[in-house]
């Protein structure tokens, strides 16, 4: 063998042996720089499957586990160190108060961990806004918590779940997301968990906030427009660790020719508070007012809200003499969010004046 080749061969071999370990070291260094994000899966459409790609509205929710969701978006590895947990596997219309508590306590445990930088929760869209607001009230952390879902199952043509999940992890990984309360990422927008609601039930641009989004996500980068104005998370007086159960709060709907039957039945069935989902400015029919006055005298809290689609804003002592009736107004919260705040608030107080303060501040 040529002497030069004899000299080169061992050197080349040594280089080949060194390269893989150098690549591994570089990969490890990259992973150390990435945020650590935990994805908590609860089911919903984002984990759903249809019979064919043409089925975007008819499908079975809560079919895929968290590992398959993560595997379906391999690009997640480029923006975060991701691991998943299956907390539950249900369609979100079936989520109970006990499920809220279970999820909330697991989020709190993870938020305390030094090796967790952000948390993403995959969720069905039907009650996503309720869960997001609940967590916004009770999680004592400034770490990013992002709730995400999809309007189409992953088996559908032009499914939105993969990009929504990618955006959620990107937002949860972003240090700028800290201290902004619980967030919702859908359709490239970053929404406040307090403000956002499902406004459309069939389109991908389904989630809207009456006061506009907090920001947007474009190719994994967050762009922020505003901050939350109400108390939340670290500034909240509520703590999931101190809540073991939630009181029964129900919603009754106001409409033309309404009677007081539903209100009385809900109270007889154990409701500690009733959310009146009223027309317009939380208006109450003259056929219902006497029953609500009587229920309040018997200890049931009466909270007026509005069921208008966007931007309901209930003014105190407008339409009804709330001071005289000892009722509470929900301010700009829709009925379902008013129910969430009432439940959480009533773990601390039964006083209507205190409840009204809480509704102003949260």
Curated annotation (Swiss-Prot):
Question: Which key words are in the record?
Answer: Hydrolase, Periplasm, Signal
Tell me the first and last residues of the signal peptide: 1-25
One biological process GO term for this chain?
asparagine metabolic process
Residue numbers binding substrate: 92, 125-126
Enzyme active site: 45 (acyl-ester intermediate)
Give the first-level EC class, as a single word: hydrolase
Recorded catalytic activity of this chain's protein: L-glutamine + H2O = L-glutamate + NH4(+); L-asparagine + H2O = L-aspartate + NH4(+)
Q: Kindly list the GO molecular function terms attached to this UniProt entry.
A: asparaginase activity; glutamin-(asparagin-)ase activity; glutaminase activity
Q: Name one Pfam family in it.
A: Asparaginase
Predominant place of localization: periplasm
The record ties this protein, via SUPFAM superfamilies, to: Glutaminase/Asparaginase
Gene Ontology cellular-component terms listed: periplasmic space
* Enzyme Commission code: 3.5.1.38
Q: Give start and end of each Asparaginase/glutaminase domain.
A: 35-362
> Where's it found, cell-wise?
Periplasm
Q: Which InterPro entries match?
A: AsnASE_II, Asp/glu_Ase-like_sf, Asparaginase/glutaminase-like, Asparaginase/glutaminase_AS1, Asparaginase/glutaminase_AS2, Asparaginase_C, L-asparaginase_C, L-asparaginase_N
How this chain assembles, per its entry, is: Homotetramer.
Instruction: Please state which protein family the record places this protein in.
Output: Belongs to the asparaginase 1 family.
Q: Which PANTHER family match?
A: 60 KDA LYSOPHOSPHOLIPASE, L-ASPARAGINASE
Q: What is this protein called?
A: Glutaminase-asparaginase
Species name:
Pseudomonas putida (strain ATCC 47054 / DSM 6125 / CFBP 8728 / NCIMB 11950 / KT2440)
């Amino acid at each position: 063998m040529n002497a030069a080749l004899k000299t080169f061969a061992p050197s080349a071999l040594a280089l080949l042996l060194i390269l893989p370990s150098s690549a591994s070291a570089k990969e490890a260094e990259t992973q150390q720089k990435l945020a650590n994000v935990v994805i908590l899966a609860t089911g919903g459409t984002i984990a759903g499957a249809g019979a064919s790609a043409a089925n975007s509205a008819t499908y079975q929710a809560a079919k895929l586990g968290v590992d398959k969701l993560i595997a379906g978006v391999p690009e997640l590895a480029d923006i975060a160190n991701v691991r998943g947990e299956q907390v539950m596997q249900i369609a979100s219309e079936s989520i109970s108060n006990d499920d809220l508590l279970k999820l909330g306590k697991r989020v709190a445990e993870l938020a305390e961990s030094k090796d967790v930088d952000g948390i993403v929760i995959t969720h069905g869209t039907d009650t996503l806004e309720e869960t997001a607001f609940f967590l916004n009230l009770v999680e004592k952390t400034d770490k990013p918590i992002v709730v995400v879902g999809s309007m189409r199952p992953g088996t559908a043509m032009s499914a939105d779940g993969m990009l929504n999940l990618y955006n959620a992890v990107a937002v949860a990984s972003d240090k700028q997301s800290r201290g902004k309360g619980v967030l919702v990422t859908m359709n490239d927008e970053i929404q406040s968990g307090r403000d956002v609601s499902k406004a459309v039930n069939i389109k991908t641009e389904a989630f809207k906030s009456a006061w506009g989004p907090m920001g947007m996500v474009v190719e994994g980068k967050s762009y922020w427009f505003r901050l939350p104005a109400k108390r939340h998370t670290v500034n909240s007086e509520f703590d999931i660790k101190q809540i073991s159960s939630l009181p029964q709060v129900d919603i009754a709907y106001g409409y033309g020719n309404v009677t007081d039957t539903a209100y009385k039945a809900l109270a007889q069935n154990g409701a500690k508070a009733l959310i009146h989902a009223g027309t317009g400015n939380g208006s109450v029919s003259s056929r219902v007012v006497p029953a609500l006055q009587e229920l309040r005298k018997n200890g049931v809290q009466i909270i007026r809200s509005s069921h208008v689609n966007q931007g309901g804003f209930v003014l105190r002592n407008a339409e009804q003499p709330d001071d005289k009736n000892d009722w509470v107004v929900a301010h700009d919260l829709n009925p379902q969010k008013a129910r969430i705040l009432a439940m959480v608030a009533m773990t601390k107080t039964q006083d209507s004046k205190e409840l009204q303060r809480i509704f102003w501040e949260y």
